[in-house]
């Protein structure tokens, strides 16, 4: 799957939520996420623009690989994710294989949805508030159309496309 994603920093969560609802987004759920990232054995993922993580989402665990970003505008990239039963054993496996653990990213995420576009408001420990718009696609040829839709949503929220952040939360933390 390819995840088309854009992220912007926000100041007023309530204002953004109100605007999202006016655009037809519906609240889905609120959850806590802790992401434990690992750096590569044979390459530095910061240099190759890849990511490998274990996510704890309210007690549900996932391993995710993210490939390099595929454009200069967004955070669009290949994403492969699998649910796992035991995050600690997976963590041990990665360490035994030589992967280096990076300090975790913790956030409270509120998810809103309109059709197949998800809007997440993240309150990230040590970084503040962000809005992420994302949609999973299987055909790369859909990417530009999806990005156009997302740009229209930003415009309706009075957020300039110049405010788009391509850096991950790890990069924003300087890790």
Swiss-Prot record:
Residues 1-175 form the CYTH domain. SMART domains: CYTH. GO terms for molecular function: adenylate cyclase activity; ATP binding. It catalyses: ATP = 3',5'-cyclic AMP + diphosphate. GO terms for biological process: cAMP biosynthetic process. One of its GO terms (cellular component) is cytoplasm. The active site is at residue 37. Its EC number is 4.6.1.1. InterPro entries: Adenylyl_cyclase_CyaB (IPR008173), CYTH-like_dom_sf (IPR033469), CYTH_domain (IPR023577). It is an enzyme of class 4 (lyase). Its main location: cytoplasm. The keyword Disulfide bond does not apply. The keyword Nucleotide-binding applies. It is found in: Cytoplasm. Keywords: ATP-binding, cAMP biosynthesis, Cytoplasm, Lyase, Nucleotide-binding. NCBIfam families: cyaB (TIGR00318). Could catalyze the biosynthesis of cyclic AMP (cAMP) from ATP. Belongs to the adenylyl cyclase CyaB family. This is Putative adenylate cyclase MJ0240. It comes from Methanocaldococcus jannaschii (strain ATCC 43067 / DSM 2661 / JAL-1 / JCM 10045 / NBRC 100440).
């Amino acid at each position: 799957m390819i995840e088309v994603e854009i992220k912007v920093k926000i100041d007023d969560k309530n204002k953004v939520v109100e605007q999202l609802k006016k655009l037809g987004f519906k609240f889905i759920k609120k959850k806590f996420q802790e992401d434990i990232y690992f750096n590569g054995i044979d390459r530095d993922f910061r240099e190759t623009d890849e990511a490998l993580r274990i996510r704890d989402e309210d007690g549900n665990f996932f391993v995710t690989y993210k490939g390099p970003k595929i454009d200069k505008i967004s955070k669009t990239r290949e994403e492969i994710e699998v649910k796992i039963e035991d995050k600690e054993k997976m963590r041990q496996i990665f360490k035994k294989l030589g992967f280096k653990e990076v300090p975790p990213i913790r956030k409270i995420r509120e998810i809103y949805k309109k059709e197949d576009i998800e809007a997440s408001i993240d309150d990230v420990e040590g970084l503040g508030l962000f809005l992420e718009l994302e949609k999973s696609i299987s055909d790369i040829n859909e990417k530009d159309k999806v990005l156009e839709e997302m740009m229209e949503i930003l415009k309706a929220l009075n957020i300039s496309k110049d405010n788009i952040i391509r850096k991950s939360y790890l990069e924003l933390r300087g890790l």
